[in-house]
Amino acid sequence: MNSKLKFIYEGKAKKIFAYEDSDKVIIEFKDDATAFNALKKAKFEGKGELNCLISSKIFEFLIKNNIPTHYIGLKNNNSMIAQKIKIIPLEVVLRNTAYGSLCKQTTIKPGTVLESPLIDFYLKNDTLNDPLLTKDRINLLKIVDEEELDFISNMTLKINKLLKKFFYNIKLDLVDFKLEFGYNSNGQIVLGDEISPDNCRLWDLNQKNGMIVSLDKDRFRNDLGGFIEAYSEINKRINNFI
């Protein structure tokens, strides 16, 4: 990084640097993999680069389809330029198929295709383990107002339609994914963070025996092996498609 950049934040998977006198930031993707709120950690060479490249291509696809995002462009293979945004402390999870926490909290069997997409909201707070929120609790905490929450929900549904088709074209089933949003310098709500196998649950549609083959962070989370190979496969399929 050069002298015009100032370090402002480091999270589990990314570092953020701000340009002086600008509303732009550099997001540098790290090689760290974490699970269970960082109770499980490891480093995988090349992970940051893969997540950055995958995210950049998906952001470009979404922007072409009129989704407002913070993404501006690539700086290099493991860093992107983005708008500086004020993150809304909500994690927005959309589920197309039941898996993970939904099955632990309900009687729905894993792998059940939902009749319609389900949106869950979680408070973005590691100390509290990102608790599930109701709309009334979101209102109580004054995280966003009702109109903004409707906007976020509608945008999430639109993103889901686009991503389901995008991933289906590269033989991947989009099971669920997590989004984050924020306010840009104009006060507009835009999609932030990243879209990668770190925050999307993706199952390989090339399997013909009915087995679930994850090509996402579940390979690290559940000790399945082939973690970097799965991310590399997704990047390869995207490159072959676009």
Swiss-Prot record:
Task: Keyword check for Ligase, yes or no.
Answer: yes
Its annotated pathway reads: Purine metabolism; IMP biosynthesis via de novo pathway; 5-amino-1-(5-phospho-D-ribosyl)imidazole-4-carboxamide from 5-amino-1-(5-phospho-D-ribosyl)imidazole-4-carboxylate: step 1/2
Q: Which domain of life is it from?
A: Bacteria
EC number annotated for this UniProt entry = 6.3.2.6
The entry lists its GO molecular-function terms as:
ATP binding; phosphoribosylaminoimidazolesuccinocarboxamide synthase activity
Task: List the cysteine pairs that form cystine.
Answer: none
Q: Which InterPro entries match?
A: SAICAR_synt/ADE2_N, SAICAR_synt_PurC, SAICAR_synth, SAICAR_synthetase, SAICAR_synthetase_CS
Query: What's in the keyword line of the UniProt record?
Result: ATP-binding, Ligase, Nucleotide-binding, Purine biosynthesis
According to UniProt, the reaction catalysed is:
5-amino-1-(5-phospho-D-ribosyl)imidazole-4-carboxylate + L-aspartate + ATP = (2S)-2-[5-amino-1-(5-phospho-beta-D-ribosyl)imidazole-4-carboxamido]succinate + ADP + phosphate + 2 H(+)
Q: Which CDD domains match?
A: SAICAR_synt_PurC
Q: Among the record's GO biological process terms, what is one?
A: cobalamin biosynthetic process
Say which family it is in. Answer: Belongs to the SAICAR synthetase family.
Protein name per Swiss-Prot or TrEMBL? Phosphoribosylaminoimidazole-succinocarboxamide synthase
Q: Which gene encodes it?
A: purC
